[in-house]
């Protein structure tokens, strides 16, 4: 990498030295100088559409948009000159001309970027008469509502849908003041590819796109609590927004696995149950005479449970008892459960529902690598890689945020190999789709390794210094020619060869697998085969 070129500029009289690759806006942010924006999203929407970020650069005969203008040596920049302020006030006047300003009835009042800027620049009502057409709200989507009259056409939602979530659902229709976001939240929303992830609503600076489960609040009067999504194992982080001890909203955090993204489950299914009227608020004990559950105290409930456990243990022995934990329970809760079962019950009958899904991974990777866990963080396997091999996994449904990041990778040019009997959503973007006969994952992997070895693509240095048992593996896979594997797996042998060459020749090529590999009678062997394939070409842990 070359040395960073530094540039000297002056912003509002403050001399600073910055990386020459930065924009004026980024340079100002590093210097803690505030420049207002409406449409800007870093690396996603740097189009300068709203013109709120304009600044005055000495020597220029016009204002420039700071979000997409690079710094230059000796630049003298003014962010608050009379000319700049007049321009921003004019922008706000034009935006408010076609904007419904009944803020008190808007769910985003108090958390609206347009409202904040209008108050800051003293523009509460436009001096112009708007000419935009009137459109009815689109409310049929169960999670999201679109209010066209509140839209300022900043394009943040469109860019987020197409470049971040990479779902390609939101588009523009019409032009000029009649430009409208084609949001599929009307009666036909089910017929679109919209995943209702809500990432579009997250970036909306007004109340045009809103989540239906979001309750009205003012930003300065709430508490935000960082936590982890309880649904899948991606580990997305978000903030629960709490007002008067009630959760009113959820905001994504820039966590290592989700990077400000959330899926429909994380955004819309993560907190409503907390205050649900259907939740039990106290213990219930069944009345033997009436057969109905009746309210009890905690002491009564715990005494009953403890006495039953003692009774069973005394009559049938410790092994008549067991503890079974939920995979969504925190590690601390699972630890306390097994402690109680082993110490109080006197048995090792402890289990967790995740064992059925993931014991094959723990056993298989522990045997081949010494650790039963993934070798790289999610950011490694979806960023800056050449090929992704997706085996027995449908992340768009099971782990949607990972699915979004894989779509991002494909948009950036990463090649995709899908190995799955099903026509999953990502197979539409795949360079190769191998539709294996279910249960033939080991044969598939052996066939891949057969081609890799015969083509001389094995990483001999990695094998010699980092592995053992290669000669035995080589002898086993020798029989798994593409033609034999094609008969076992019901695939085209040429497609198998093509996939093997694409995978082996790539510099960085992670393998992402899921329950399609593990939930078989040969699940552990399937995991070991995936691991062997990665070691054969020396791609283990590369990022």
Labelled PLM ranges:
Residues 100, 215-543:
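Catalytic alpha/large subunits of respiratory electron-transfer oxidoreductases
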Residues 8, 22-26, 70, 330:
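Short, structural beta-strand-to-alpha-helix junction motif
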Residues 14-22:
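Short, contiguous acidic and Ser/Thr-rich linear segments
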Residues 15, 169, 237-239:
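Short, surface-exposed charged micro-motifs
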Residues 51-197, 202-228, 243-246:
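Fe-S ferredoxin-like electron-transfer domains
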Residues 34-41, 214, 538-541:
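Active-site phosphate-binding and catalytic loops of NTP-dependent enzymes
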Residues 24-58:
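A basic, amphipathic helix-loop patch mediating RNA/tRNA/ribosome contacts
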Residues 4-14:
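Eukaryote-biased recognition of intrinsically disordered, low-complexity regulatory segments
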């Amino acid at each position: 990498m070359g040395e960073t070129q530094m540039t000297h500029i002056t912003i509002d009289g403050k001399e600073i030295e910055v990386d020459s690759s930065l924009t004026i806006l980024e340079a100002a942010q590093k210097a803690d100088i505030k420049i207002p924006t409406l449409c800007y999203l870093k690396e996603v929407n740097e189009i300068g559409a709203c013109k709120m970020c304009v600044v005055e650069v000495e020597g220029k005969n016009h204002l420039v948009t700071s979000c997409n203008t690079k710094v230059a040596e000796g630049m003298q920049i003014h962010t608050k000159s009379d000319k700049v302020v007049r321009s921003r006030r004019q922008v706000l006047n034009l935006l408010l001309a076609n904007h419904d300003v009944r803020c008190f009835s808007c769910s985003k009042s108090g958390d609206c970027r347009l409202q904040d800027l209008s108050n800051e620049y003293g523009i509460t009502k436009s001096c112009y008469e708007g000419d935009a057409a009137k459109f009815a709200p689109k409310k049929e989507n169960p999670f999201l509502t679109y209010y066209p009259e509140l839209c300022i056409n900043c394009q943040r939602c469109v860019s987020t849908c197409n470049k971040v979530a990479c779902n390609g659902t939101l588009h523009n229709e019409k032009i000029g003041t009649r430009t409208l976001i084609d949001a599929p939240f009307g009666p036909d929303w089910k017929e679109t590819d919209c995943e209702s992830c809500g990432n579009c609503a997250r970036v909306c600076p007004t109340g045009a796109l809103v989540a239906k489960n979001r309750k009205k609040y003012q930003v300065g009067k709430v508490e935000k609590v960082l936590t982890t999504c309880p649904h899948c194992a991606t580990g997305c982080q978000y903030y629960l927004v709490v007002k008067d001890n009630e959760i009113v909203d959820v905001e994504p955090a820039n966590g290592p696995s989700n990077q400000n993204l959330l899926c429909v489950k994380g955004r819309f299914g993560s907190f409503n149950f907390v205050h649900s009227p259907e939740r039990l608020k106290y213990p219930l004990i069944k009345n033997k005479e009436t057969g109905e559950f009746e309210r009890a105290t905690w002491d009564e409930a715990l005494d009953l449970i403890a006495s039953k456990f003692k009774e069973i243990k005394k009559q049938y022995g410790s092994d008549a008892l067991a503890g079974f934990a939920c995979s969504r329970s925190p590690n601390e809760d699972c630890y306390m459960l097994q402690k109680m079962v082993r110490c109080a019950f006197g048995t090792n009958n402890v289990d967790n529902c995740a064992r059925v899904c993931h014991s094959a991974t723990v056993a298989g990777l522990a045997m081949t690598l010494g650790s039963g866990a993934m070798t790289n963080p999610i950011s490694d396997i979806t960023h800056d890689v050449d090929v992704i091999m997706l085996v027995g996994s449908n992340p768009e449904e099971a782990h949607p945020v990972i699915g979004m990041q894989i779509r991002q990778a494909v948009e950036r040019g990463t090649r995709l190999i899908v190995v799955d009997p099903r026509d999953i959503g990502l197979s539409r973007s795949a360079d190769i789709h191998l539709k294996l006969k279910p249960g033939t994952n080991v044969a598939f992997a052996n066939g891949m390794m057969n081609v890799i070895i015969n083509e001389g693509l094995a990483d001999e240095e990695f094998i010699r210094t980092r592995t053992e048992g290669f000669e035995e593996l080589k002898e086993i896979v020798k029989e798994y020619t593409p033609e034999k594997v094609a008969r076992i797996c019901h695939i085209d042998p040429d497609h198998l060869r093509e996939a093997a060459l694409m995978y082996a020749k790539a510099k960085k090529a992670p393998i992402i697998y899921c329950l399609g590999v593990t939930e078989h009678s040969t699940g552990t062997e399937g995991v070991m085969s995936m691991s062997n394939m990665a070691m054969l070409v020396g791609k283990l842990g590369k990022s």
